[in-house]
A protein has these predicted regions:
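Catalytic histidine neighborhood in serine/cysteine hydrolases
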Residues: 298-315
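Short beta-strand/loop motif that positions the catalytic acidic residue
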Residues: 272, 278-280
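Catalytic active-site module of serine/aspartate enzymes centered on a nucleophile-bearing elbow/loop
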Residues: 310-339
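N-terminal cap/lid segment of alpha/beta-hydrolase-fold proteins
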Residues: 16-55, 62, 66, 316, ...
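Active-site nucleophile elbow and catalytic-triad environment of alpha/beta-hydrolase enzymes
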Residues: 245-268
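Catalytic nucleophile-loop/oxyanion-hole region of alpha/beta-hydrolase
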Residues: 100, 114-151
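Short, surface-exposed "cap/lid" segments of acyl-processing enzymes
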Residues: 53-55, 72-122, 137
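Alpha/beta-hydrolase-fold enzymes
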Residues: 146-250
Length: 339
């Protein structure tokens, strides 16, 4: 990917924040998503938002059953987008990927991690960065139901989970997906967790995430009294403390340190046996450049794109106010080359 940030957006923070809030996400009409609810293996649910081309949207709209809707989209390639921390199909990158998918004649789907679709999930759990088991059943359902090839991209947290899944599946992943990609993913969770907990990051990004995550966690406590210590959660001031109190114990980890170590994809990248792309920006405020994987530590199936600029899932391009299609276009080109 050849990319240089526009002169009017210097620095990783501006490239991150402006891209998310102000840059254009699509060329024509805003992508329209239509929702299906899937029952999980543990009898919970996830919501999957499909964005399809107009000629297919009518077919999907008429479908009454979720699986019927999945099968109604023909043999076009399917791009599955796993969102980032507290993301959704409304995130700037999700709409941009959907727009790029449409321009290529692809179908796009955004499965929401539990509790991220606007409705709290049922079980005594949420989602986490290393949940390759969740990625597994979701991708396998897509592969079974969809007649065409399946590709997957994960953004930030979703990309780490996707790469963990690819590593766990090994050569079997080729039976499910043609290729995978991670974008600005914290493949070393400890390094990224500490980076986001300091200085400007702590004051801006950490506060933003906690404003969303803490109320959802408290609703989860109302659902399941005694699940965790309410006072300790309210005292959490960074993601480490939040993960220590909520994310780690609810998902089978001893504490935040254990979670960050075991969930990180970086130590497992050499096990990936499906075409995979790991795209990062060296000025990403969330991810120290020294924590990024190097060619010698990944397998032959993993391609590393490490760009000088772009911020965290930003990569704005063009004259003011800019657009964010350059990154999805480049990632889609990589995935298309695997078909």
């Amino acid at each position: 990917m050849n990319y240089a940030a526009p002169w009017w957006l210097p620095g990783g923070n501006l490239q991150t924040i402006w891209a998310a809030l102000r840059s254009r996400r699509f060329l024509g009409d805003q992508p329209v998503f239509r929702r299906e609810r899937w029952t999980t293996p543990d009898r919970d649910f996830v919501d999957v938002d499909w964005s399809v081309q107009p000629k297919t949207a009518g077919v999907l709209r008429r479908a009454k059953d979720g699986r019927e809707a999945e099968k109604s989209m023909g043999a076009q390639p399917l791009l599955v987008v796993f969102h980032g921390l507290e993301g959704s199909s409304a995130s700037h990158y999700a709409e941009a990927f959907a727009d790029v998918a449409h321009s290529r004649g692809w179908v796009c789907a955004v499965p929401h991690f539990r509790g991220c679709s606007g409705e709290l999930n049922l079980g005594p759990r949420a989602y986490h960065s290393g949940d390759f088991a969740e990625i597994d059943w979701i991708l396998k359902r897509f592969a079974i139901a969809h007649a065409g090839p399946v590709m997957a991209v994960g953004i930030s947290l979703g990309g780490n989970a996707l790469m963990r899944w690819a590593a766990e599946e090994g050569a079997q992943a080729r039976q499910i997906v043609a290729g995978v990609a991670s974008v600005c993913s914290p493949l070393d969770l400890a390094a990224s967790g500490w980076a986001i907990g300091r200085g400007f990051n702590r004051q801006v990004y950490t506060r933003m995430f906690l404003r969303s995550m803490v109320p959802k966690a408290l609703k989860k406590l109302d659902q399941h009294p005694g699940l965790f210590d309410r006072d300790k959660l309210l005292a959490a001031r960074d993601l480490y403390e939040f993960d220590n109190i909520f994310t780690a114990p609810l998902h089978g980890f001893k504490n935040a340190d254990d979670y960050w170590e075991r969930a990180s994809a970086k130590p497992h990248l050499h096990r990936i046996a499906v075409p995979a792309l790991a795209l990062n920006a060296l000025n990403d405020p969330f991810i120290p450049p020294g924590s990024l994987p190097q060619p010698a530590s990944v397998g032959k199936h993993v391609t590393l794109w490490q760009l000088a600029t772009g911020g965290h899932v930003g990569f704005p391009s063009g004259p003011f106010p800019g657009h964010v299609r350059a990154m999805p276009e480049a990632v889609a080109s990589f995935l298309a080359s695997q078909l």
